[in-house]
């Protein structure tokens, strides 16, 4: 019996405010769906953040519907929890999964009041949706009930969407030891880097599936090391970390941390960009360059990248001035995302304050009522 674990598609996210990056994220999701159909697992579990926003754009909804309908046509059910990006900040607004459920019916199973489902009378699947730090005590109560309800099952999976220590030691909401110790697979979302860890003396596997595309430049190094995509698990026999394998998708190339201090560095970087032109998608470039080479380099690579962020290096001052194609708003949004803050709320408040919006306090009040 096989299952797929996926998370953090963030459909609708427009990195650098580019159509091409929004489409990349749709394509990565649909590539995952196509690979899942090739594998034909018994079911799919999804650990949240299907969408970038709780009010996703039409194209994001269309993409999600296209992919999930393909699974339905192959009789592959999907078990899905809400991540922080999927949950509306105002209680008056509906959740996007409602529309999906109306069309997909029982092939899409979510975890609201009902914290568990059972697949084929054999596999117990529990789910706890994302909550803010102040609501974690309620999550512990939910975990106790899930653990109690699962006692008569040998095969058990638990979905969650939180930051967990030691994977995020600087800013976490829960500990690995907070989770029931007799579940086979603890399936996480929220963290965009892949992670697999045997726990409970190797009898359980704790996992983050990671995102299905590069959502931030901070993810590039991990992508090159561990890839992006989903996990495939096998519950047929004795279950341990060897029962899990990575299934990868290909993302657009990012060239980062390039230092151009002389003509040789210049030539190598241009050649690397030229060699990537045979790929279907133009790369994204982050680099530092000395002042005297900046103008010629900027002109030469003008048509070789989708997006570039170049820092001029003043070797005397050992400082850099960033010259890029971003607006202040784009840089601000990326900074918020890198800090793992709530991009939708912080950026929404920022815009309201700029416009002297009288509803700013109501906006903040609705957010905190819904999250704390």
Curated annotation (Swiss-Prot):
Its EC number is 3.1.-.-. Its cofactor is Mn(2+). Mn(2+) 1 binds at residues 8, 10, 49, 192. It is an enzyme of class 3 (hydrolase). Mn(2+) 2 binds at residues 49, 84, 161, 190. The keyword Disulfide bond does not apply. The active site is at residue 85. The keyword 4Fe-4S does not apply. It holds the Pfam family Metallophos. GO terms for molecular function: 3'-5' exonuclease activity; DNA end binding; endonuclease activity; manganese ion binding; Y-form DNA binding. InterPro entries: Calcineurin-like_PHP_ApaH, DNA_Repair-Maintenance_Comp, Metallo-depent_PP-like, Mre11_archaea-type, Mre11_N. CDD domains: MPP_Mre11_N (cd00840). Gene3D superfamilies: 3.60.21.10, Mre11, C-terminal domain-like. One of its GO terms (biological process) is double-strand break repair. Nuclease activity is regulated by Rad50. Keywords: DNA damage, DNA repair, Endonuclease, Exonuclease, Hydrolase, Manganese, Metal-binding, Nuclease. PANTHER family: COMPONENT OF ATP-DEPENDENT DSDNA EXONUCLEASE, NUCLEASE SBCCD SUBUNIT D. Homodimer. Forms a heterotetramer composed of two Mre11 subunits and two Rad50 subunits. Belongs to the MRE11/RAD32 family. Part of the Rad50/Mre11 complex, which is involved in the early steps of DNA double-strand break (DSB) repair. The complex may facilitate opening of the processed DNA ends to aid in the recruitment of HerA and NurA. Mre11 binds to DSB ends and has both double-stranded 3'-5' exonuclease activity and single-stranded endonuclease activity. This is DNA double-strand break repair protein Mre11. It comes from Methanococcus maripaludis (strain DSM 14266 / JCM 13030 / NBRC 101832 / S2 / LL). The gene is mre11.
């Amino acid at each position: 019996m096989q299952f797929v674990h996926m998370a953090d598609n963030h459909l609708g996210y427009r990195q650098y405010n580019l159509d091409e990056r929004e489409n990349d994220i749709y394509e990565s999701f649909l590539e995952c769906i196509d690979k899942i159909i090739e594998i034909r697992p018994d079911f799919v579990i999804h650990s949240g953040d299907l969408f970038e926003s709780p009010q996703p754009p039409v194209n994001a909804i269309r993409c999600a519907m296209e992919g999930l309908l393909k699974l339905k046509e192959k009789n592959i059910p999907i078990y899905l929890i809400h991540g922080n990006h999927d949950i509306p900040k105002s209680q008056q607004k509906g959740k996007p999964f409602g529309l999906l459920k109306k069309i997909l019916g029982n092939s899409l199973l979510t975890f609201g009041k009902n914290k568990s489902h059972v697949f084929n009378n054999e596999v117990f699947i529990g789910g706890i949706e994302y909550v803010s730090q102040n609501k974690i005590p309620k999550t512990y109560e939910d975990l106790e009930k899930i653990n109690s309800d699962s006692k008569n099952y040998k095969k058990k999976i638990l979905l969650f969407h939180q930051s967990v220590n030691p994977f995020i030691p600087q800013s976490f909401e829960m500990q690995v030891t907070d989770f029931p110790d007799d579940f086979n697979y603890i399936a996480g979302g929220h963290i965009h880097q892949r992670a697999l860890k045997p726990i409970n003396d190797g009898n359980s596997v704790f996992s983050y599936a990671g995102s299905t595309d590069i959502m931030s430049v901070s993810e590039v190094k991990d992508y090159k090391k561990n890839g992006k995509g989903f996990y495939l698990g096998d519950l047929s026999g004795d279950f341990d970390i060897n029962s899990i394998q990575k299934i990868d998708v290909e993302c657009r190339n990012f060239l980062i941390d390039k230092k151009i201090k002389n003509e040789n560095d210049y030539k190598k970087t241009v050649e690397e960009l030229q060699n990537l032109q045979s790929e279907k998608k133009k790369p994204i470039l982050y680099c530092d360059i000395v002042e005297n080479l900046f103008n010629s380099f900027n002109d030469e690579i003008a048509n070789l990248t989708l997006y570039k962020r170049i820092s001029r290096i003043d070797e005397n001052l050992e400082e850099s001035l960033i010259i890029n194609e971003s607006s202040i708003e784009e840089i601000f949004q990326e900074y918020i995302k890198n800090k793992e803050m709530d991009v939708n709320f912080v950026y929404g408040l920022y815009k309201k304050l700029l416009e002297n919006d009288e509803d700013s306090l109501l906006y903040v009040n609705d957010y905190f009522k819904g999250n704390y």
